[in-house]
UniProtKB/Swiss-Prot annotation:
GO terms for molecular function: structural constituent of ribosome. This is Large ribosomal subunit protein bL27. GO terms for biological process: translation. Belongs to the bacterial ribosomal protein bL27 family. PROSITE patterns: RIBOSOMAL_L27. Keywords: Ribonucleoprotein, Ribosomal protein. Residues 1-26 are annotated as: Disordered. The keyword Transit peptide does not apply. The keyword Ribonucleoprotein applies. The lineage of its organism: Bacteria, Pseudomonadati, Pseudomonadota, Gammaproteobacteria, Pseudomonadales. GO terms for cellular component: cytosolic large ribosomal subunit.
Length: 86
């Protein structure tokens, strides 16, 4: 009786590709319009002023300026805004 499984019969050996989620531009960084700021699943970060949200909840800059992260509201939600360059 074999004490090792035959080659090719293992139940392991697969893994999903990483999705490269997370913050792409940090607070204080300069961005141009269209730059991706955060890639996320769901709204961990909410869109503030001059920030748009894509169908996959990606946050992107609508204007040129500096990235600003802030916490607001009774639920302490995290918002990302773009402060236009003056």
């Amino acid at each position: 009786m074999a004490h090792k499984k035959a080659a090719g019969s293992t139940r392991n050996g697969r893994d999903s590709e990483s999705k490269r989620l997370g913050v792409k531009r940090y607070g204080g960084e300069s961005v141009s319009a269209g730059s991706i700021i955060v890639r996320q699943r769901g709204t961990r970060f909410h869109a503030g002023s001059n920030v748009g949200i894509g169908k996959d909840h990606t946050l992107f800059a609508k204007a040129e300026g500096q990235v600003k992260f802030e916490t607001k509201g009774p639920q302490n939600r995290k918002f990302v805004s773009i402060v236009p360059a003056a």
